[in-house]
Amino acid sequence: MAKTNGFMGHDMLAPFTAAWMIDMGPLVIDKAEGSYVYGVNGKKYLDSLSGLWCTVLGGSEPRLIEAASKQLNKSAFYHSFWNRTTKPSLDLAKELINMFTANKMGKVFFTSSGSEANDTQVKLVWYYNNAIGRPNKKKIISRKNAYHGSTYMTAGLSGLPSLHLKFDLPPPYILHTDCPHYWNYHLPGETEEEYSTRLANNLENLILKEGPETVAAFIAEPVMGGAGVIIPPATYFEKIQAVLKKYDILFIADEVICGFGRLGTMFGCDKYNIKPDLVSIAKALSGGYIPIGAVLVSEEISKVIMSQSNQLGVFCHGFTYSGHPVACAVALEALKIYKEKNITEVVNKLSPKLQEGLKAFIDSPIIGEIRGTGLVLSTEFVDNKSPNDPFPPEWGVGTYFGSQCQKHGMLVSFSGDHVNMAPPFTLSLEELDEMISIYGKALKDTEKRVEELKSQKK
């Protein structure tokens, strides 16, 4: 259908898309209703990833649409430069300060995306250390397999080789420590807590090797999303935070995916007792209806930044759309809905059925691990149920599973041989049953495909 609608070989340079996909023609989405999206091909798809982890209230929440329309009719745009701003941006900043309770925050800086938020974090960390007389404390430690965005800085922070390849990344001041994927990387007989201890020791050794006086911050998602929903092993963040505190290294919590209920708590920091100095949010902040992100800055860092800006005459960082009034109005309405619906309770009621329903497929011979919490889950396909036996990349097992899901009427995210699902919080029990059913059908198709490929290999 894409061809007949004139979209084959289209003119858009599409993100995270190979040229051969463009030549085939894209799946073009025409409209959204609740948990479903509809293509111009007339087909209906259950959206099991909430767009890109963001449309948590479904695709047709009238209150968010009304909030945007009302603000557009009142004031479509005004900036927040030079001590000028709009009421929605001030109201949203106050609401976020009150809402985030894992640590006391002092200020909110608005962006248009999670990438911009994480990019801003690095500048704030450098600005802060310069202000307090630590000009050499600039290195940022991230984790292997992490995803923190795709700007120059945040692609460097990301620990995925594909984001670095041919982009001359990462820069030398960005370092990467272990990915905390217990199933994949633990030693024989090693418990989760022992694994966490080893990773914390490795982090400390990296800091000592680089020189603690040169390491400024550590960035982490509470649960790693793009890496394939990596759940932190027992005591991991407790041990990591102890190392950071020992060497006076700031903690940046990337809550872009985890924030606003996805894990069954309002923020991932609440679930894992993380006390961050800086926090990045986006995606569900507006329910995905309009681009907006934000940086939450601790009281201590806020005071230093404000003092430094007075000395310099200006805090010289910002974007045209920082605190866009329409985006802020939509975000305010989204936060109201989360409170009214007690969204974490909604997630915790749906979570057991999603987790148990999909984890029931763990005995499949092509599945190594199904991992998840709250309303987020990932399936990792391997041979012999072992992380040491991946399928040949050219087999495209994860891609094939994703294509079969689409054929049966459901959209998932796939990267390599892991497949992610993070459905809207508005999902009905019937829709959840449909999701599990389609997953099972696609899995059978994929098992058959793997058997065919194995027989051809003999």
Curated annotation (Swiss-Prot):
Superkingdom of origin: Eukaryota
Binding-site residues, pyridoxal 5'-phosphate: G114, S115, D254
Keywords attached to this entry: Aminotransferase, Cytoplasm, Pyridoxal phosphate, Transferase
N6-(pyridoxal phosphate)lysine, modified sites: K283
Keyword Transferase: yes
One GO term describing the cellular component: cytoplasm
PROSITE patterns (alphabetical): AA_TRANSFER_CLASS_3 (PS00600)
Pfam families: Aminotran_3 (PF00202)
Alphabetized InterPro entries for the sequence: Aminotrans_3, Aminotrans_3_PPA_site, PyrdxlP-dep_Trfase, PyrdxlP-dep_Trfase_major, PyrdxlP-dep_Trfase_small
GO molecular function: 4-aminobutyrate:pyruvate transaminase activity; adenosylmethionine-8-amino-7-oxononanoate transaminase activity; pyridoxal phosphate binding
Catalyzed reactions per annotation: 4-aminobutanoate + pyruvate = succinate semialdehyde + L-alanine; 4-aminobutanoate + glyoxylate = succinate semialdehyde + glycine
GO BP, one annotated term: gamma-aminobutyric acid metabolic process
Enzyme class, spelled out: transferase
Binding site for substrate: Y147, K283
UniProt note on tissues of expression: Expressed in leaves, roots, stems, flowers and fruits. Expressed in carpels, but not in stamens.
EC number: 2.6.1.96
The protein's role, per its UniProt record: Transaminase that degrades gamma-amino butyric acid (GABA) and uses pyruvate or glyoxylate as amino-group acceptor. Cannot use beta-alanine, ornithine, acetylornithine, serine, glycine, asparagine, glutamine, glutamate, valine, leucine, isoleucine, methionine, phenylalanine, histidine, lysine, arginine, aspartate, threonine, tyrosine, tryptophan, proline, or cysteine as amino donors. May be responsible for establishing the GABA gradient in the carpel.
PANTHER family for the chain: ADENOSYLMETHIONINE-8-AMINO-7-OXONONANOATE AMINOTRANSFERASE (PTHR42684), GAMMA AMINOBUTYRATE TRANSAMINASE 2 (PTHR42684:SF10)
Protein family per UniProt: Belongs to the class-III pyridoxal-phosphate-dependent aminotransferase family.
Protein name: Gamma aminobutyrate transaminase 2
Gene source species: Solanum lycopersicum (Tomato)
Gene label: GABA-TP2
